[in-house]
Amino acid sequence: MAHKKAGGSTRNGRDSNPKYLGVKRFGGQFVNAGEIIVRQRGTRFHPGPGVGCGRDHTLYALVEGLVQFTTKGEKNRKYVTILPEQREEAAS
């Protein structure tokens, strides 16, 4: 004979891992080709010149230069572009 009452199962008790979404490089920052600029779900930001879009809508730099965020078009879409500029090397 059981001396403990059977415990009921619960439907809660799990959590998903964090996805670390968001802007990784901000306007005016220098980026190298291949650096991730924005991790997002869907196209919250659209790729402009010098920016590529990955399979999961991640925006990344195709060229090195300065990041610029702009809003344009009828729908006021946010675009990320790269202004190709040579980085000033620090004299050391």
Swiss-Prot record:
Keywords attached to this entry: Ribonucleoprotein, Ribosomal protein
Sequence similarity: Belongs to the bacterial ribosomal protein bL27 family.
Protein source organism: Legionella pneumophila subsp. pneumophila (strain Philadelphia 1 / ATCC 33152 / DSM 7513)
PROSITE patterns in alphabetical order: RIBOSOMAL_L27 (PS00831)
UniProt-recorded name of the protein: Large ribosomal subunit protein bL27
Residue ranges, annotated region (Disordered): 1-20
Keyword Ribosomal protein assigned: yes
Residues annotated as signal peptide: none
Molecular-function GO terms, alphabetical: structural constituent of ribosome
Pfam family, one: Ribosomal_L27
Entry's Gene Ontology BP terms: translation
An example Gene Ontology CC term for this record: cytosolic large ribosomal subunit
InterPro entries in UniProt: Ribosomal_bL27, Ribosomal_bL27_CS
